[in-house]
Amino acid sequence: MYRMQLLSCIALTLALVANGAPTSSSTGNTMKEVKSLLLDLQLLLEKVKNLENLKLSRMHTFNFYMPKVNDTELKHLKCLLEELKLLEDVLDLAPSKNRNTREIKDYMASLKGIVLELQGSETRFTCEYDDATVKAVEFQNKWTTFCQSIYSTLT
């Protein structure tokens, strides 16, 4: 008698898990990853604030776009990935032997890995950006605030 309801419940649970819906067991991992992301963003911000390198000072003139939304959903981290790719292009990190730019590249690689892990299989989201732009330090401050908001909603 309850077999159909049980099967429906199992099917719904599998559909939610397959589509990346957070489960109670994944919340702890998500919190750790968001905390790591937050730490890497803060470390990257400290390196970017260092103006002793010509490439870094060039980066401070580049304009970045922020997403239109004020939500704290993990799917919006895709927008961070898109803008980090542009930051990497601006810095032209590949041939650089400078210690600061190598460290920035390492932090960015770590950020990308964490964001991809947090996103899971969700790839259908399209970022919508504000028309106004921000400079590099403000860009990173806003993403740090975004990650702090996500972390506080998970705790």
Swiss-Prot record:
It is found in: Secreted. Disulfide bonds join 79-127. Glycans are attached at residue 23. It holds the Pfam family IL2. The keyword Ligase does not apply. PROSITE patterns: INTERLEUKIN_2. GO terms for biological process: adaptive immune response. Keywords: Adaptive immunity, Cytokine, Disulfide bond, Glycoprotein, Growth factor, Immunity, Secreted, Signal. SUPFAM superfamilies: 4-helical cytokines. Residues 1-20 form the signal peptide. Gene3D superfamilies: 1.20.1250.10. Its main location: secreted. One of its GO terms (cellular component) is extracellular space. It comes from the Eukaryota. SMART domains: IL2. GO terms for molecular function: cytokine activity; growth factor activity; interleukin-2 receptor binding. Cytokine produced by activated CD4-positive helper T-cells and to a lesser extend activated CD8-positive T-cells and natural killer (NK) cells that plays pivotal roles in the immune response and tolerance. Binds to a receptor complex composed of either the high-affinity trimeric IL-2R (IL2RA/CD25, IL2RB/CD122 and IL2RG/CD132) or the low-affinity dimeric IL-2R (IL2RB and IL2RG). Interaction with the receptor leads to oligomerization and conformation changes in the IL-2R subunits resulting in downstream signaling starting with phosphorylation of JAK1 and JAK3. Belongs to the IL-2 family. This is Interleukin-2.
